Amino acid sequence: MQRAGGGSAPGGNGGGGGGGPGTAFSIDSLIGPPPPRSGHLLYTGYPMFMPYRPLVLPQALAPAPLPAGLPPLAPLASFAGRLTNTFCAGLGQAVPSMVALTTALPSFAEPPDAFYGPQELAAAAAAAAATAARNNPEPGGRRPEGGLEADELLPAREKVAEPPPPPPPHFSETFPSLPAEGKVYSSDEEKLEASAGDPAGSEQEEEGSGGDSEDDGFLDSSAGGPGALLGPKPKLKGSLGTGAEEGAPVTAGVTAPGGKSRRRRTAFTSEQLLELEKEFHCKKYLSLTERSQIAHALKLSEVQVKIWFQNRRAKWKRIKAGNVSSRSGEPVRNPKIVVPIPVHVNRFAVRSQHQQMEQGARP
């Protein structure tokens, strides 16, 4: 027999291997009856790259290799010729060999497209699947084991219909790369979303940390020099807290817990700062009840009020010790007190409030 002959074995060889002696069995006997069903069930009977070998047992395939001088188009011509003259003589006797053939089919491992063209492959597979479904229930029952699902086989049919590249590399190039491209796109999308969402968070973090360091350096140089960091702990807190007092508001409404090395700043509003300054003019140290009253009135936590007063006292001591230009030894009533003003607040209105407060505070 010739394996290149396209889906047929000579009658004695193939039939003797599969069914009874003298049974002629070929693809033609399968194609003869009613036209094959097309549609989604085209390849359901067989595995992906195994379905279109000559339908005989592997023992019958062994003796005859491909003839050396045969051009590659000869199998197509012979197979097309064999498709035209169909005969149905040995169909009933060939059914037992059909069972053996469907069991033997998955053992073929070579891709079929070296032998047959895509249209012949599709026609042969359709005929074999339709005939096996009609005439023999056992191959139909065995079909899900050796075959792939219709959803997996439909892409294979589309890919087989593209002649230039052989299916196995082409299949592995296109279809596995489709989910990979989807993943790449989704990860890029996630990266874009993260980069679109991160600037807010990263800016806040950078603003929080960088703003602390910048404010600290600025305040230390402006109020007492870098020696303020070398002093005891209250002065360190004072340098940090005056950053919240003088610097730009970093994060609004975040409680600044005490005792943390790097904590979030509390951005006080100008009204809160004015009230705190008033209280500090009256009293440098607060009792617990006063602190709770002030915190409740200003809608702050007691910890925020306590830390603000600690920082304000440290700043006041720094100014008292280092600022020689303070008038009459009372730096508290100095009109050069710096109060942080948010950007959205009118600075002139706040300055006029400051002047009114200063005038009202003086006797």
Swiss-Prot record:
Q: Which biological processes are named by the entry's GO terms?
A: adult walking behavior; neuron fate commitment; proprioception; regulation of nervous system development; regulation of transcription by RNA polymerase II; sensory neuron axon guidance; spinal cord motor neuron differentiation
Q: List the Pfam families.
A: Homeodomain
Q: Does the keyword DNA-binding apply?
A: yes
Disulfide bond annotation, renumbered to this chain: none
Q: Name one GO molecular function term.
A: DNA-binding transcription factor activity, RNA polymerase II-specific
Q: Which GO terms describe its cellular component?
A: chromatin; nucleus
Q: Where is the composition biased (Low complexity)?
A: 128-139, 219-239
Main localization of the protein? nucleus
- Quote the DNA-binding region ranges, renumbered to this chain: 261-320
- Where, per UniProt, does this protein localize? Nucleus
Where are the stretches annotated Disordered? Answer: 1-31, 128-265
Print the keywords alphabetically: DNA-binding, Homeobox, Nucleus, Transcription, Transcription regulation
Q: Where is the composition biased (Gly residues)?
A: 1-22
* Bias-annotated ranges (Acidic residues): 203-218
Question: Which protein, by its recorded name, is this?
Answer: Homeobox protein GBX-1
Q: Which taxonomic lineage does the organism of this UniProt entry have?
A: Eukaryota, Metazoa, Chordata, Craniata, Vertebrata
